[in-house]
Design a protein with these regions (language model features):
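Assembly/oligomerization scaffold segments
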Residues: 1-133
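Short beta-strand-centered interaction patches in the first periplasmic/extracellular domains
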Residues: 118-121, 125-127, 162-253
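Structured segments of extracytoplasmic/periplasmic soluble domains
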Residues: 150, 154, 188-191
């Protein structure tokens, strides 16, 4: 069974960074031009996001030769909404893949030059875009966990884990966005095993799907790793790592 490890931070290898055009069948692999890639997910974020820094030399492969070409922003073109299939591997062999791809949210900070262009690409999940176009309108009756499951289904979202709730809560959508509604419901939810004073729920997305989790149930789980935060940078023997230690990096092997 794979386990978590601590390892010195080091560059990873982007083995695939394929962007597909929205206006043709053309697709380009920019893995050789991506100089920085940052991926974000958080229990406080409704959607996964990522940012890439791309250096475009203005040349592309043509069989065994290289020829001049328009920049990728204009040749593909990249305007927003393009699906991007990404695969990253670190120095420990951990592989990060996005089975449903990520989608270009915006192109920013383009810096054209005489020999190369540099620009940033911001990415989000497909459900992020669907959330912007969908509204919750109808009346809901029953348990909150069932409401959340139905609402996320309207944007074709899939759940990684959904904790059941107790008690019934009835409401009308009032033309709100799905993510907003689910976050609002999370603050009112009570886990099914207890109807007393509880901490509520968290609604967030990982690359494996959406999660609607009871905060109490999360804290009842056995810890995977123990970390300490102090100004000395030293790690006592009873903990796994110091948050401030130089080069500390937490990896999940899969």
């Amino acid at each position: 069974m794979p386990a978590y490890q601590n390892a010195p931070a080091s560059p990873g290898n982007i083995s695939k960074f394929k962007i597909s055009s929205n206006v043709s069948d053309k697709a380009l692999d920019l893995s050789g031009g991506v100089v920085e890639f940052r991926y974000y997910e958080s229990v406080l974020s409704n959607s996964i996001t990522a940012t890439a820094v791309v250096v475009d030399s203005g040349y592309e492969g043509d069989g065994g030769s290289v020829k001049a070409a328009k920049g990728v922003l204009d040749s593909l073109p990249i305007r927003g909404g393009e699906r991007t299939d990404i695969a990253v591997e670190d120095n420990l062999g951990n592989k990060l893949k996005f089975k449903d791809g990520l989608y270009v949210n915006r192109v920013r900070d383009a810096d054209p030059g005489t020999q190369k262009d540099v620009f940033f690409l911001d990415f989000a999940s497909a459900e992020f875009f669907a959330n912007e176009q969908q509204r919750v309108m109808q009346r809901f009756e029953g348990k909150i966990s069932e409401h959340v499951k139905e609402i996320i289904g309207t944007i074709n979202g899939k759940f990684e884990q959904l904790d059941n709730t107790s008690l019934s809560y009835n409401f009308i959508g009032n033309d709100r966005k799905p993510f907003y509604t689910c976050t609002w419901l999370a603050s009112k939810a009570v886990p099914d095993k207890d109807v007393g004073s509880r901490a509520g729920f968290l609604f967030y997305q990982t690359r494996d799907g959406f999660n609607f989790r009871s905060i109490d149930k999360l804290f009842e789980q056995d810890p995977v790793k123990t970390f300490i935060f102090n100004n000395t940078g030293e790690t006592p023997p009873e903990v796994d790592a110091n948050v401030l230690a130089s080069g500390t990096k937490i990896e999940k092997l899969e």
